[in-house]
Amino acid sequence: PLNHSISLKGINGKDLQILIAEDNDSNYSLVKHILKEYQITRVVNGVEAVEKVRDEEFDIVLMDMKMPIMGGLEATRKIRELNPIIPIIALTANAFDADRVSAMEAGCNAFLTKPLKKEELLELFSFKL
């Protein structure tokens, strides 16, 4: 098996600060396990994601596209108004081209389908940061 060991640093050389917007506990647990070396903050809807990006500094956002209260597309658009450069990776169970296009048009930098694969996520991190 491939062994990805990444030592990415975040803002000011501190540990990478990752915001995960994911309402499903199982999906969150998987992402948290993959990224256990980093500082993770979880929110469960788009409203909370926008508030966190407004109030705190993050190096990257992992954004579920289907969440209650405010979905990932709308949250991504609002985050782009606050921070046009933060990398946002869309997470979705939908692998259709239209979903990928919608995510990119909203402002996502990349698009991953669930269930997430460790290698794909870590590969994106190495390119995006």
Where are these regions (language model features)?
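Conserved acidic carboxylate
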Residues: E22
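Charged docking surfaces used in two-component/phosphorelay signaling
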Residues: S29-H33
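The feature encodes the CheY-like receiver
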Residues: P68, F96
